[in-house]
Amino acid sequence: MTENSTSAPAAKPKRAKASKKSTDHPKYSDMIVAAIQAEKNRAGSSRQSIQKYIKSHYKVGENADSQIKLSIKRLVTTGVLKQTKGVGASGSFRLAKSDEPKKSVAFKKTKKEIKKVATPKKASKPKKAASKAPTKKPKATPVKKAKKKLAATPKKAKKPKTVKAKPVKASKPKKAKPVKPKAKSSAKRAGKKK
């Protein structure tokens, strides 16, 4: 009996350890997923609400908060959870597996529709560009005409310069006036000779 008594106490602690792991609570990742599924919030569940749910439904130790933080980070990195708000372990989280297939199908449909719609738009854009191009060309020609007009105005400005040259010509008749007296003097000389 002494042998049985010594072997029995040795077996009991092992069972106690095994029972703590199995019966107290499941894995933190499973508890977090269960908490998010229970809330069913479209915006996602916050870390605090997940902690409250786990503490109220499972027997968790004192270090549960730190374990929940670590497991949330792991689930985000593995792709089980999606972080909708915040950074790191803070913010809101949703299950990625349940949302991804629906969203991916919706995104694929929208992408196909966008591609279909985009192709006619692309075809219509060159037409619009072609229609705009001829309209721009006639607009450009009046601008050229305006430039020609502007070029003509300096020519008009040059004409006054020629007008300024006319007074120089007017000075020539002044020179001609002294010539006339010379003619008179030559006539006087001719008279004297007679």
Curated annotation (Swiss-Prot):
It is found in: Nucleus; Chromosome. Pfam families: Linker_histone. ADP-ribosylated on Ser-104 in response to DNA damage. Keywords: Acetylation, ADP-ribosylation, Chromosome, Citrullination, DNA-binding, Nucleus, Phosphoprotein. The modification N-acetylthreonine is found at residue 2. One of its GO terms (cellular component) is nuclear body. The modification Citrulline is found at residue 42. Induction: Both the unedited and the RNA edited versions are induced by butyrate (at protein level). Only RNA edited version is induced by DTT, vinblastine or TNF (at protein level). Residues 105-194 have a biased composition (Basic residues). The modification N-acetylmethionine is found at residue 1. InterPro entries: H1/H5, Histone_H1/H5_H15, WH-like_DNA-bd_sf, WH_DNA-bd_sf. Residues 1-29, 84-194 are annotated as: Disordered. Residues 24-97 form the H15 domain. PANTHER family: HISTONE H1, HISTONE H1.0. Histones H1 are necessary for the condensation of nucleosome chains into higher-order structures. The histones H1.0 are found in cells that are in terminal stages of differentiation or that have low rates of cell division. This is Histone H1.0. The lineage of its organism: Eukaryota, Metazoa, Chordata, Craniata, Vertebrata.
